[in-house]
């Protein structure tokens, strides 16, 4: 692979020249608004710089990012911007880590349009709103760290959703397998989602390992050798991929029927994003891979819901909303998806197999005594769906072999770290001062 080739999210070596200093770093420009905010930023994110020169450079970066933040806020009345964990990075550092590779990606987009199968979508009946988080098809937000691996997170997030919607349990899959093993892409130096799908099909028979068996370790920018451990577990299998029509109506129709879509966009407006809907998103070049998980056209400002890979402490618990209908951030330029054969166990054929049963409802019995016999209340709950609670929280209940997992969340989308509790399927278990029995019912 040519070393000079650029790629989506490519990470260049950025040299920030800082003057040497023997004295330890100390607070500078105390009393100015920017300096006060900078001190708060350092406390919040645990920053400590080795020299006074480096601290001065980081403060200068911080001040410049404050200016950019205010510019974005002035252009986006439906969104809120603020100080994020990226604010001590220079524009060059941030772009090199997260926003590089436009020229290569443009060429790759043209190649995809010519050589990949195009999906068709029924445009006659597009729902007003869809959110695949609420239907259990999206894993928790992840963090690529200081590695240009957004392409892997976008591709893996798409496969996770397609695997679930083909009739399987939602499972978190391995980005590290792609970052370390996929030689059609460039690991932390960038890549493309369609090429990730191609590599899986050509080299692993479409198999992707679980995150538990092959966890992500490249958040510091280091890419270890590809693992061939006998302890790796196959979590999903794809059998193809499609290029989705690059109109937003076609994307909405396909997403509503088929699930989350891997897309590329211009993330130049994302550094200081906190919440709300971006209506004036920069759209100059594709530079970042993300996952489109839903949309809502019922309000004053219609918007897309996008899962990012910058951690749950960025944006709306790791998500961003972007206005629909104007190709904001160039988000309709490169929508793609893997394809999963319905109800196939990893590495098997469905030609003569009965589809695996899928949990539909959980019968939950909560009782006052310890044996699930007295003062009991029975409730039927839809499995694998996000259920909003009062006060802005939500809960989800999931079935897996021999156990049931109940999770509560502080947000309405069942994303991020939840408080989870497991019980055996169909068996009584202690629950607070009484007992509980969860029984999964399948189709």
From Swiss-Prot:
Gene3D superfamilies per record: Cysteine proteinases (3.90.70.10)
Family classification: Belongs to the peptidase C1 family.
Active site per database record: 150, 288, 308
Name of the protein this chain belongs to: Cysteine proteinase B
Endpoints of the signal sequence: 1-27
Record GO terms (molecular function): cysteine-type endopeptidase activity
Pfam families found in the cross-reference section: DUF3586 (PF12131), Inhibitor_I29 (PF08246), Peptidase_C1 (PF00112)
Top EC class for this record: hydrolase
GO biological process, one term: proteolysis
Keywords for the protein's UniProt record, in alphabetical order: Disulfide bond, Glycoprotein, Hydrolase, Protease, Signal, Thiol protease, Zymogen
E.C. designation(s): 3.4.22.-
The species this protein was found in: Leishmania mexicana
InterPro entries: DUF3586, Papain-like_cys_pep_sf, Pept_asp_AS, Pept_cys_AS, Pept_his_AS, Peptidase_C1A, Peptidase_C1A_C, Peptidase_C1A_papain-like
Positions of disulphide bridges: 147-188, 181-226, 281-329
Propeptide: 28-125
Residues annotated as glycosylated: 228
């Amino acid at each position: 692979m040519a070393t000079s080739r650029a790629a989506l999210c490519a990470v260049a070596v950025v040299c920030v020249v800082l003057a040497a200093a023997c004295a330890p770093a100390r607070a500078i420009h105390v009393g100015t608004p920017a300096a006060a905010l900078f001190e708060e930023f350092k406390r919040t994110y645990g920053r400590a710089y080795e020299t006074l020169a480096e601290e001065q450079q980081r403060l200068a970066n911080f001040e410049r990012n404050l200016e950019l933040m205010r510019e974005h806020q002035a252009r986006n009345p439906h969104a809120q911007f603020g100080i994020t964990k990226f604010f001590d990075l220079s524009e060059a550092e941030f772009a090199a880590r997260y926003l590089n590779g436009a020229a290569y990606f443009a060429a790759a987009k043209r190649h995809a349009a010519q050589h990949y199968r195009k999906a068709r979508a029924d445009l006659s009946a597009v729902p007003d709103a869809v959110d695949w988080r609420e239907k259990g098809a999206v894993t928790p937000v992840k963090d690529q760290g200081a590695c240009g691996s957004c392409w892997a997170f976008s591709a893996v997030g798409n496969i996770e959703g397609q695997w679930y919607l083909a009739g399987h349990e939602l499972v978190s899959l391995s980005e590290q397998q792609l970052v370390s093993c996929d030689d059609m892409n460039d690991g932390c130096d960038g890549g493309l989602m369609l090429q990730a799908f191609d590599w899986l099909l050509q080299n692993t028979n479409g198999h992707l390992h679980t995150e538990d068996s092959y966890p992500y370790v490249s958040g510091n920018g280091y890419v270890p050798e590809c693992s061939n451990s006998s302890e790796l577990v196959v979590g999903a299998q794809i059998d193809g991929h499609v290029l989705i029509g690059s109109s937003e109506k076609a994307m909405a129709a396909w997403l509503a029927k088929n699930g989350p879509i891997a897309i590329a966009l211009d993330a130049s407006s994302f550094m200081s994003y906190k919440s709300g809907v971006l209506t004036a998103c920069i759209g100059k070049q594709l530079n970042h891979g993300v996952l489109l998980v839903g949309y809502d056209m019922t309000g004053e400002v219609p918007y897309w819901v996008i899962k990012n890979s910058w951690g749950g402490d960025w944006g709306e618990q790791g998500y961003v909303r972007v206005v629909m209908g104007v190709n904001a951030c160039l988000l309709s330029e490169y929508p793609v998806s893997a394809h999963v054969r319905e109800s196939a166990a990893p590495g098997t054929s469905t030609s003569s197999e009965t589809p695996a049963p899928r949990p539909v409802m959980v019968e939950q019995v909560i009782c006052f005594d310890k044996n699930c016999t007295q003062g009991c209340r029975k409730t039927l709950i839809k499995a694998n769906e996000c259920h909003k609670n009062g006060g802005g929280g939500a809960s989800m209940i999931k079935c897996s072999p021999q156990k049931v997992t109940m999770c509560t969340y502080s947000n309405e989308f069942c994303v991020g770290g939840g408080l989870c509790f497991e019980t055996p399927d169909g068996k009584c278990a202690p629950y607070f001062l009484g007992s509980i029995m969860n029984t999964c019912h399948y189709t």
